[in-house]
């Protein structure tokens, strides 16, 4: 993940100003500090703020130019769930993963995103032979493999999660999920209102007369705080950052591995030769997995409903803050759909 550097230029309370910049690479921090603390620091801070104002104005312009249709019209254009055939799962209820094997998640790591986090954009494994980025990419990759082996062999991180399949039905743009006590929880979904596009909502992929939905919450961040603090105490900030990035990638890989298990063993709609990890990372399988906070369902508060459905805080080390952020931060929470589309 990029590192945030905040520089506060102190003056009187009336003239206090703040410049906030983004460093994609750790080594860029020194360059930013040198400019901020140098004789032209004020000019640099002013340039940062001017660039950010230009970005805000461009974002606002794009929003104004979006051709949206009224929500009532978008709902009339919905494809509906009538064509959707519910898939009855083999097993319902919860499945707890108290200590998922890192080795089982490792094949699902998307290394392209790992390199992007270091500012090395390119597809893995081709980036390792890139004429300009290859040398640095190979070094970072070797360091990542060494630390990943330690994480796996010394059990430095614990992968924990809960997933389950529950009865569900759609009602307009909402998904209603029935918990173990027969109570319905309402999950409001957004609907695409862009003119000329499919005005879909996630609720369209759940049948109104009865269906099933998967829920999950998982993390690869148990133990990361202690591991990073140990590295920093030894003056090894690089390894602390590396551990954080690997925990992020392992969380996504863990989610892919659990989704594969759900499709084949719990839901049972995936048969025959399973997708390879490479195919799974590219989403080449039936069904979909989505996490809250992304465009299809940006409402983080829905995590509370899923946490309660799965009894996440009673069975794992994950906690949900009052602002609906998951602790540890290297975590995912969302829904799974069996729809063939």
State the predicted function of each range.
Residues 1-12, 16:
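Conserved structured catalytic cores and adjacent interaction surfaces
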Residues 251-263:
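Charged, low-complexity helical/coil segments in non-catalytic cytosolic or luminal regions
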Residues 269-288, 292:
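Extended, well-ordered alpha-helical scaffold/bundle regions in very large, multi-domain proteins
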């Amino acid at each position: 993940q990029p590192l945030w550097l905040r520089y506060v230029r102190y003056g009187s309370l009336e003239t206090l100003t703040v410049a906030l910049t983004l460093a994609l690479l750790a080594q860029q921090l020194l360059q930013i500090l040198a400019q901020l603390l140098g004789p032209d620091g004020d000019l640099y801070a002013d340039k940062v703020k001017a660039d950010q104002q230009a970005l805000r104005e461009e974002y606002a312009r794009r929003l104004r130019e979006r051709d949206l249709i009224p929500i009532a019209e978008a709902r009339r254009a919905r494809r509906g769930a009538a064509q959707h055939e519910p898939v009855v799962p083999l097993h319902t209820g919860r499945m707890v993963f108290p200590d998922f094997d890192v080795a089982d998640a490792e094949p699902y790591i998307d290394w392209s995103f790992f390199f992007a986090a270091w500012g090395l954009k390119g597809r893995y494994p081709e980036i390792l032979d890139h004429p300009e980025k290859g040398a640095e990419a190979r070094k970072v990759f070797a360091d990542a493999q060494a630390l990943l082996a330690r994480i796996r062999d010394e059990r430095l991180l614990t992968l924990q999660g809960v997933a389950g399949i529950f009865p569900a039905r759609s009602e307009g743009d909402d998904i209603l999920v029935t918990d173990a006590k027969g109570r319905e929880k309402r999950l409001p979904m957004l609907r695409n209102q862009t003119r000329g596009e499919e005005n879909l909502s996630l609720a369209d992929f759940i049948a109104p007369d009865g269906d099933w939905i998967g829920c999950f919450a998982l993390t690869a961040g148990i133990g990361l705080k202690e591991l990073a603090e140990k590295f920093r105490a030894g003056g090894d900030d690089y390894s602390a950052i590396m551990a954080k990035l690997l925990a992020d990638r392992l969380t996504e890989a863990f989610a892919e591995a659990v989704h594969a298990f759900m499709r084949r063993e719990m839901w049972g709609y995936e048969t025959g030769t399973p997708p390879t990890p490479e195919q799974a990372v590219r989403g080449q399988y039936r069904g979909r997995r989505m996490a809250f906070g992304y465009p299809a369902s940006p409402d983080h508060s829905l995590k509370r409903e899923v946490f309660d459905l799965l009894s996440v805080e009673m069975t794992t080390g994950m906690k949900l803050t009052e602002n609906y952020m998951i602790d540890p931060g290297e975590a995912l929470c969302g829904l799974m759909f069996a729809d063939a589309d």
